[in-house]
Every structure is written in structure tokens, then in C-alpha cells.
């Protein structure tokens, strides 16, 4: 039997580069929320995959951007902390709009030089551009940094992932596996449940409102028939926000609850009874209390 190998990998990049989609594709299950809106990942999420004798632990970090608010600054600090703590960094770049973000990418790379010398460039969303555009972007990005390796992928369609995983397995050091073989994440059921509901809030509420909302799973109960009872609290900053979350005659919260329940049943592979309660609290002043579930 071959000696076990283990590698810790950070998935970093600008918001909406496809980091969460990549980690979901790698583990083969949706463990990280995905929305069209930027900065939806608030807490680093680990996804675990096995390739031969190698266990690779990916950490999906919050997007790196120019932070202004207390919450935003906390997210960016969290992202850089994850980068420092892992063996190697994958910098994910959305090739479909990289020129618009080139200065932001340069800023990340400049800091990366002082934090983590080993970096792999992963050019994502290749399904959205022509081959000539991809080739030009590949050459341009390669000039910005001395990358260990460059891969082109479509995380959404899983194109190019096998080459990336194979390479990471090759460079992984000999170490015992950190997690059990069947484990695909170290996130708790409570956290994953809250994230699912938070995703549905992002998808159903307009503009900036979802950014001012936190979700906490208060209670999970396993029944004899293997179904789950999940009770969650949605915290809104203001009473006016609470009214919008609830919607006219409770229409919004009902729709959000139905969509979240369907997603939770896919995730946990069982019947789920979901109960949502909306409360008003200025939770942003208590980030330490909420960071695991916000």
C-alpha cells in the first residue's frame, strides 16, 4: 500500500471568480453557496477529496476586495489568514472579465508575494470565451507572476479539473490523512443548513438587503423515520428589513423556506421539516458570536 499524502490548498481570488463552484465540483456535492452576487462567502469552508493515496483539503475563502465596513474587513482578514495557513494557493481568475479586474488581480499578487510564494493560477470560466481570447488572457496573466503552474478550467462544467487534481496529488507531501476517507467537509450540519437558507435569501431578496442578514441554525432534531427537524433564526438589522424578508402575507419567507427545504433534502438525503423565524438584531456588532453562521 502506498504511503499516504496530504495537501492543504487555499482557493483565493476576487469575488465571483468561481471559488465556491470549484470546491463544489471537486467534492461532488454542493457544500458552498453559489449566487450571482459578490461576497456571499463569509466563512472559510473546507472541501475534502481523495485522489489515489492523496487527500487534498481545499479551503474556499471569502473573496479578496477593497473592504470598507467592519464586516467586509473581517472577511478579507479571514481570506488572508487562510492563505497563510495552507500549503499552496490557487488563484482563481474569471477569464471572461479579467481585463476589467486586472489592477485588482495585480494588487492581490503583490501581497501574495509577501504572504505565500507558491501559487497556482487557475483560469476559470473558459466556457464563456473564445479560444483566441483564452490564449491572449493566458499569456497576459502569465506575465504578472511566477506561477508554479497554470490550469484552464470550467468549474461549472468540471472541465479541466482532473488535470488540476492530478497535479496537486503529485506535489502533495507524504503525510497521514487529516480526515476520514468518507468525509467531504468539516462543516457542521448546523452551519451547512444555515448557509443553504442564506443562499436562498440572496437569491430572493433584492439589492443590498441580503448582506445585512445573518442566519443561525438554532436546533436540529433527527426523528425515528430518519427525517430532520431544522429550526433557524434569520436576523435582520431593522424592522423594515424584517418586513421585506417576510413579504406580503408571508410570501417571501414561504418561498425562501420551500427552496431551502428542497436544497437541504438534497444535501442530507432525507426528508426535512424546516421552520424559519425572523428576528431583529444588530448582529454586525457581534461578529464573533455569529461568524460561524453568518
Which stretches of residues belong to each language-model region?
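Active-site glycine-centered loops adjacent to acidic/histidine catalytic or metal-binding residues
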Residues: 60, 124, 154
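P-loop NTP-binding site
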Residues: 189-294
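Canonical P-loop GTPase G-domain recognition
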Residues: 117-118, 127-189
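Catalytic P-loop NTPase motifs of RecA-like helicase/translocase cores
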Residues: 41, 64-66, 99, 129-130, ...
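Conserved glycine(s) of the Walker
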Residues: 18, 160, 252
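Conserved G1/Walker A P-loop phosphate-binding module
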Residues: 1-84, 88, 93, 233-235
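Conserved C-terminal guanine-recognition region of P-loop GTPase G domains, centered on the G4
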Residues: 49-55, 74-150, 221-224
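Active-site phosphate-binding and catalytic loops of NTP-dependent enzymes
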Residues: 32-34, 101, 176-180, 203-214
Amino acid at each position: 500500500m502506498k504511503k499516504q499524502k496530504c495537501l492543504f490548498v487555499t482557493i483565493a481570488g476576487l469575488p465571483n471568480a468561481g471559488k465556491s463552484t470549484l470546491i463544489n465540483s471537486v467534492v461532488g456535492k454542493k457544500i458552498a453557496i453559489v449566487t450571482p452576487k459578490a461576497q456571499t462567502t463569509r466563512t472559510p469552508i473546507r472541501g475534502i477529496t481523495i485522489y489515489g493515496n492523496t487527500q487534498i483539503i481545499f479551503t474556499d475563502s471569502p473573496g479578496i476586495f477593497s473592504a470598507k465596513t467592519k464586516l467586509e474587513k473581517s472577511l478579507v482578514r479571514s481570506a488572508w489568514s487562510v492563505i497563510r495557513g495552507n500549503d499552496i494557493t490557487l488563484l482563481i481568475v474569471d477569464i471572461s472579465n479579467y481585463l476589467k479586474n486586472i489592477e485588482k488581480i495585480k494588487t492581490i499578487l503583490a501581497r501574495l508575494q509577501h504572504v505565500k510564494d507558491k501559487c497556482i493560477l487557475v483560469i476559470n470560466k473558459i466556457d464563456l470565451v473564445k479560444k483566441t481570447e483564452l490564449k491572449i488572457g493566458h499569456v497576459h496573466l502569465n506575465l504578472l507572476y511566477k506561477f508554479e503552474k497554470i490550469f484552464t478550467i470550467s468549474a461549472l462544467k468540471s472541465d479541466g479539473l482532473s488535470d488540476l487534481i492530478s497535479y496537486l496529488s503529485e506535489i502533495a507531501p507524504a503525510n497521514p490523512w487529516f480526515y476520514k476517507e468518507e468525509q467531504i467537509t468539516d462543516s457542521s450540519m448546523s452551519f451547512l443548513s444555515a448557509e443553504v437558507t442564506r443562499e436562498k435569501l440572496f437569491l430572493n431578496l433584492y439589492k443590498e438587503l441580503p448582506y445585512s442578514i445573518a442566519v443561525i441554525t438554532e436546533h436540529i432534531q433527527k426523528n425515528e423515520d430518519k427525517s430532520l427537524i431544522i429550526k433557524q433564526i434569520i436576523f435582520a438589522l431593522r424592522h423594515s428589513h424584517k418586513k421585506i424578508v417576510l413579504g406580503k402575507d408571508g410570501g417571501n419567507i414561504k418561498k425562501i423556506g420551500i427552496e431551502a427545504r428542497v436544497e437541504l433534502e438534497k444535501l442530507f438525503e432525507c426528508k426535512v421539516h424546516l421552520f424559519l423565524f425572523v428576528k431583529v438584531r444588530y448582529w454586525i456588532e457581534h461578529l464573533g458570536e455569529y461568524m460561524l453562521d453568518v
